Amino acid sequence: MSIEVDWRAATSGPDGEALAERIRSFIHDKFQQVALPRFIRSVQVHSFDFGTIPPDLEVKDICEPFADFYEEDEDDETSDVSEELVSGHGTQWHRDLNEPPFHEEMAMNRPLRDPFDEAFHSSTLRSPMEHLNPHFLPRAGTPGIPGGTSTLGYHLMSLGGLSGTQTPLAAVAGGTPFANGWTDPGMGASSRGHPSISGPTAVHPSRMEADIDTSNPTSRPSTSSTLPSHPSASNQPSGDATTGKEHGSLAEDEHLDDPMTSGHPLRLPPRMRERRPEDFQVLCHAKYAGDVRLSLTAEILLDYPMPSFVGLPLKLNVTGITFDGVAVIAYIRKRVHFCFLSAEDADALIGSDQQEARGQDDRPWSSADPTASPKRQGGLLREIRVESEIGRKEDGKQVLKNVGKVERFVLAQVRRTFEEEMVFPSFWTFLI
């Protein structure tokens, strides 16, 4: 189902002008936070305009909103007055932490166990916190600009360096067991009461980053590598059996830090709003090749006759972009949440364009055909058209050699800001 958007009514008037000004201010603030190259002194964003060409929207699915949209923001003062919170989750969390058996077990000094004890490895006891819903546990962070820096909405932390079917969104759509937050000690965990990598105290962040293979984009932290590994008793020399056990005990003691006494206390889960029957979410395939405009000025430093001798303003005008992606619009009470999906998540939820076209033609997809890949290729922003103005030109080229570098830097920052602030799990929230 296709939707015709009245682009002029949505982007004009006082509300449209106010929204354009907030977008301009947001992009300007982002440029003030990034590290500029040596040959650029400053970047100023002067204006933003939505243009006159509307996007082409095709509704793919209407479903329930993502659970991330129900997380309560601590800075939102109006939510406490106008909305009801799910009271059972937070009180149940505190009640479980304050129960005497759980508190005494976490606080007392437990004796070290023999790492080679067969009965210990075959134990079926599980963590007291296993009954908690895994989606209440915070996700691992990843380096970069977090999604919560936007002044236009309420953003979430970015995914923990995972992509493709390893992301929680794609894992839910593909049926992969990503959200199983707790591991049975009999199935490979090292001690009772310590969760797997998705738990809040499972592993130190520096160890988590070390476990990620950056050379493989589909890799994710291994659960086995986050817990102490012990060599089998048969591999130890007979004379060093005692030494091997002592070494295993020390290694186990290093990872069995008591969360009640260590410097990393258990973090409370985010408060969740109550789901209502009238909440809904729309997935749209958005295509845009319009004339959105963005005006910037970058000051170029000249190093002749001395370093940073003078600065020349370079005016850059973004005259249009080409976009192809999947948009998410969720309506929850008096809030509208808006974001885009990454290519991997879009493929997992609604499939690719090639799969849809071949499904309509009843033609099977062959993996031997490299030109018919079912994956979405490239980023969401396919093209950014830009014009620069500075000094005179010779044969259609700029006289200053750094103009091209400035253009590439500015466009890279625009693309990076869009992908980090507009792609799920980051999203914008509008109060209506």
Curated annotation (Swiss-Prot):
PROSITE patterns reported for this sequence: SMP
Membrane topology: Peripheral membrane protein
Bias (Low complexity): 214-234
Location of the region described as Disordered in the Swiss-Prot/TrEMBL record: 182-273, 354-377
GO BP terms: mitochondrial genome maintenance; mitochondrion-endoplasmic reticulum membrane tethering; phospholipid transport; protein insertion into mitochondrial outer membrane
Intracellular or extracellular location(s): Mitochondrion outer membrane; Endoplasmic reticulum membrane
Coiled coil: none
GO cellular component: endoplasmic reticulum membrane; ERMES complex
CDD domains: SMP_Mdm12
Pfam families: MMM1
Ranges of Basic and acidic residues composition bias in the record: 243-253, 355-364
Ranges for domain SMP-LTD: 1-432
GO molecular function: lipid binding
Principal location: mitochondrion
Keyword Endoplasmic reticulum tagged: yes
Record keywords, A-Z: Endoplasmic reticulum, Lipid transport, Lipid-binding, Membrane, Mitochondrion, Mitochondrion outer membrane, Transport
Domain notes for this protein: The SMP-LTD domain is a barrel-like domain that can bind various types of glycerophospholipids in its interior and mediate their transfer between two adjacent bilayers.
Role of this protein: Component of the ERMES/MDM complex, which serves as a molecular tether to connect the endoplasmic reticulum (ER) and mitochondria. Components of this complex are involved in the control of mitochondrial shape and protein biogenesis, and function in nonvesicular lipid trafficking between the ER and mitochondria. Mdm12 is required for the interaction of the ER-resident membrane protein mmm1 and the outer mitochondrial membrane-resident beta-barrel protein mdm10.
Family note: Belongs to the MDM12 family.
Assembly description: Component of the ER-mitochondria encounter structure (ERMES) or MDM complex, composed of mmm1, mdm10, mdm12 and mdm34. A mmm1 homodimer associates with one molecule of mdm12 on each side in a pairwise head-to-tail manner, and the SMP-LTD domains of mmm1 and mdm12 generate a continuous hydrophobic tunnel for phospholipid trafficking.
Protein name as catalogued: Mitochondrial distribution and morphology protein 12
Gene: mdm12
